[in-house]
Amino acid sequence: MTEEYFIQGNDACARGAIKAGCRFFAGYPITPSTEIAEEMALLLPREGGVFVQMEDEIGALGAVIGAVWSGVRGMTATSGPGFSLMQEHVGYAAMTETPLVIVNVQRGSPSTGQPTMASQSDMMQARWGSHGDYEIIALSPSSVQECFDFTVRAFNLAEEYRVPVMVMGDEIVGHMREKITIPDRVKIRKRRGPSVPPEEFLPFSAPEDGVPEMPAFGDGYRIPVTGLTHDEGGYPDASNPEGHHRLVKRLCDKILRHRDRISDVQEELTEDAYITVISYGAPSRSVATAVKMAREDGVRAGYLKINTPWPFPETEVRAAAERSGKLLVVEMNLGQMFYEVQRVAAGMAEVELLPKIGGEIHRPEEILNMILKMNR
């Protein structure tokens, strides 16, 4: 039975996780994400799950990794400073192909920054925060409903591609309250277990899609798990250049080859747009209003909302660049995804940035003024 609720975005993330089958949460309180931990502490025991408050964010993500290898779905939630502490384990999860979800409710930064104010300043950290070559998936909600929906999708993507998936929220979306619809059931992608008996199983031998089968500890399969370069059996193989190349290339290709399948964008009024406004997360709310105001003023403006910043939706952004003469990137930082748009649109469209820091969202009038300026 479908039900409606009037709740915060953070609460919606927690409820989305439960609906998606999450049965383990480890975390450490940090503003503005703490409500997720509080809600998980309330909901998980009712579902037979486990909530653990760890000593810090390093331990939190380590605990999630361990729980996932025991066979459950796991998640943590944090904000900028805690996200920084998690980066070593992000790389470990990528190397060991551990499917998990991290919710980052972004706040003003760097360092301690603005704990109670909003930002989108962790977007590049989500992609490049840990050392080495690897790929992750990130989603960026702009509403409370999307906090629920994107968290559900994050778990399914994590299981499908055996990769850390990040839900990159912000203080505005995390703390706003809106009416949302929660279905009685959601589509859950089951983890792909072994298709051969234990004596024939190679834990990191990948089929054509590049994603290995994954048993749980205790299922009777031998599963060496190491952050070292490893062979298909999971055993350290760090001195083998060809083996390292083969492994890391597969870790990247299993995401990049499916980029168009993973990518999710929303477009409005872009068919005839001379100026396309590109945004993600909370600023998209102001962008939609500003574009409508621009149309009322006779300006052919449209907008492209990026729901999956990573892997970057190159196909959709390139199409927007070819279609429009000018692109305007709106984000709550001094320019992060702006550089990705510039890279993809090079030689096809003029790209401008409307940044915003200080903890506040763009007002529609600010965006409209920039659109009008670009239309001259």
Curated annotation (Swiss-Prot):
Q: Does the keyword Glycosyltransferase apply?
A: no
Superkingdom of origin: Archaea
Q: Which NCBIfam families match?
A: PRK08659.1
Gene name on record?
korA
What is the organism field in this record?
Answer: Methanothermobacter thermautotrophicus (strain ATCC 29096 / DSM 1053 / JCM 10044 / NBRC 100330 / Delta H) (Methanobacterium thermoautotrophicum)
Q: Which GO terms describe its biological process?
A: organic acid metabolic process; sulfur compound biosynthetic process
Catalysed reactions listed for this entry: 2 oxidized [2Fe-2S]-[ferredoxin] + 2-oxoglutarate + CoA = succinyl-CoA + 2 reduced [2Fe-2S]-[ferredoxin] + CO2 + H(+)
Subunit annotation: Heterotetramer of the KorA, KorB, KorC and KorD subunits.
InterPro entries annotated for this entry? 2-oxoacid_oxidoreductase, PFOR_II, Pyrv_Fd/Flavodoxin_OxRdtase_N, THDP-binding, Transketo_C/PFOR_II
The enzyme's E.C. designation: 1.2.7.3
Q: Which UniProt keywords apply?
A: Oxidoreductase
**What's the protein name?**
2-oxoglutarate synthase subunit KorA
| GO molecular function ontology, one term from the record | 2-oxoglutarate synthase activity
PANTHER family cross-referenced by the UniProt entry: SUBUNIT OF PYRUVATE:FLAVODOXIN OXIDOREDUCTASE, SUBUNIT OF PYRUVATE:FLAVODOXIN OXIDOREDUCTASE-RELATED
